[in-house]
Amino acid sequence: MRRKLVTGVAAASMAVLSQAPAHAQEPGVKADIDGDGRADPVSLRQVSDDQMLLRAGLSEEFTDAVVQGNARGLPLIPVDVDGDGTDEVMVPESVGANTVIYTTWRYTPEAGLHPVRTADGKPLGLAEGGGARALSTYGCTPAPDARLLVAVNAFATPDDSAFEGERVTYSVRDGIATLVTSAPVQGAGRDDPQLQADPATCAPLD
């Protein structure tokens, strides 16, 4: 069946593609972003120093979105942060020396590809990494008929004796991440359970 490009972003995508360097990478993954039970190819292409093109190949069309940032060759990560059986993808938008900042992108027929946002309308950013004096990670925990998304961010105290920060839990529904709990972390060692979360627990459901 002949595929078509979703027209809502076609012009912007073509403009971005026209600026793409010849060496731009396009790492791809498979994720069932439309919930039809079939894995869709999803790719990320670096088209300039600060812009990327996110593309998904659905059964009858391609859909694109322009994403600000630079993945520096890191791949997309398929996830299902709400446990509804329809996948999302984590997009590495900012890559530092020790930490990667991800945003979570989803698809709907009405809005195409778009980021999961917090209740105030901002894209939800999740950090992974940290280095010797910081710790950031995320994961998912089971909830009745769903999953909850957990984000952990902490920094070493001035004397390096412990970590302080917060552990935040979100409920993601219809692309909106609603705050459930925000628990302060104080006097915790790096191995403290309050600082633990496993990104693998957000993997797509079998």
What function would you assign to each model-found segment?
Residues 2-5, 11, 15-73, 193-206:
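Terminal domain-start segments
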Residues 2-5, 23-33, 124-206:
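Acidic, small-residue rich beta-repeat scaffolds with periodic aromatic anchors
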Residues 35-45, 81-93, 143-152:
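Acidic/hydrophobic-patterned starts of short beta strands in beta-sheet-rich repeat architectures
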Residues 50-53, 97-104, 157-169:
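Structural motif
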Residues 54-72, 114-130, 181-191:
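Blade-edge motifs of beta-propeller repeat domains
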Residues 58, 105-106, 171:
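Structural recognition of the beta-propeller blade-terminating site
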Residues 88-119:
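Long, charged/polar, surface-exposed segments that mediate recognition or autoinhibition
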